[in-house]
């Protein structure tokens, strides 16, 4: 398995490479770099790769096409990329990032500008209301028998999805949350005591961004169908534009590696 990291000449490149190396350490794999040269670029990227002891390949042409080809040729298990500094407007993460996350059937880790340079101690996983989570399953499958960081399972409940509580609303709410915890942990055959569960009620896009900050997560993991126009797309857009935490987007139809 290889983690492929896209290295450019931007100020964010140090953070991107750092995140890629920490993810590779977490999953017990190696890191290889790629730089798509434009107008003679690449000196800074080469220096960053050399300082991090990451082998670097230089490619030419369209950035998106070159990165897609590199992922396929190296059979990379995941791609780590950075976003632009100004994340505003209809394309908050930049067209290159959005094209890649929508088209590649591999996990992609998106590193925002000024991501904290620190170990991956806490991973926040957004899960579905039924407790099933492709993202949570993928995380545990890739970890195997390696040490597990703190895993925080976050479930956002829309107010309309709450069951009607009768005479004992507090007790019934606790039972509702406990049942969800059991379903989520059983879906990955994990000991519930080793997973931290958090539940929020309200609008998912804003609450996931807020929870990532409040819970001091080092990485957010989300599964989605690679469509920005529906379903998880609204949540993914909000995360790409609203959180300083690296985000691992796991396609539900991802290739197994």
Feature locations, PLM:
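Small/aliphatic-rich secondary-structure junction motif
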Residues: 1-50, 54, 122-167, 188-190, ...
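Active-site charged/polar residues at nucleotide-handling catalytic sites that mediate phosphoryl
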Residues: 74, 215
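A short acidic, glycine-rich active-site loop
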Residues: 170-178
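Charged docking surfaces used in two-component/phosphorelay signaling
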Residues: 58-66, 199-206
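Short beta-strand elements of ligand-binding domains
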Residues: 80-83, 107-114, 223, 247-252
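Glycine-rich, Arg-bearing micro-motifs that act as flexible, cationic patches
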Residues: 9, 81-102, 119-122, 221-242, ...
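A short, acidic, amphipathic alpha-helical segment used as a generic capping/interface helix at domain edges
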Residues: 182-185, 202-213
């Amino acid at each position: 398995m290889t983690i492929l990291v896209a290295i450019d000449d931007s100020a964010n490149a140090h953070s991107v490479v750092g995140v890629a190396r920490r993810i590779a350490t977490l999953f017990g794999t190696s890191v290889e770099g790629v730089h798509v040269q434009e107008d003679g670029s690449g000196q800074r990227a080469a220096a960053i790769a050399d300082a991090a002891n990451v082998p670097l390949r230089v490619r030419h042409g369209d950035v998106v096409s070159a990165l897609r080809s590199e992922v396929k040729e190296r059979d990379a298990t995941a791609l780590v990329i950075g976003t632009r500094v100004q994340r505003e407007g209809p394309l908050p993460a930049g067209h290159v990032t959005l094209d890649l996350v929508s088209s590649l059937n591999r996990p992609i880790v998106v590193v925002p500008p000024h991501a904290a340079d620190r170990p991956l101690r806490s991973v926040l996983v957004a899960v579905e209301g039924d407790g099933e989570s492709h993202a949570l399953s993928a995380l545990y499958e890739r970890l195997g028998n390696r040490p597990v960081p703190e895993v925080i399972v976050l479930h956002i409940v829309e107010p309309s999805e709450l069951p009607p509580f009768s005479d004992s609303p507090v007790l019934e709410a606790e039972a509702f949350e406990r049942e969800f915890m059991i379903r989520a942990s059983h879906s990955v055959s994990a000991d519930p005591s080793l997973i931290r569960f958090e539940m929020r009620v309200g609008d998912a896009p804003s609450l996931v961004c807020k929870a990532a900050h409040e819970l001091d997560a080092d990485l957010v993991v989300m599964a989605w169908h690679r469509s920005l126009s529906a379903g998880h797309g609204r949540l993914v857009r909000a995360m790409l534009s609203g959180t300083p935490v690296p985000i691992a987007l796991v396609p539900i139809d991802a290739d197994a590696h």
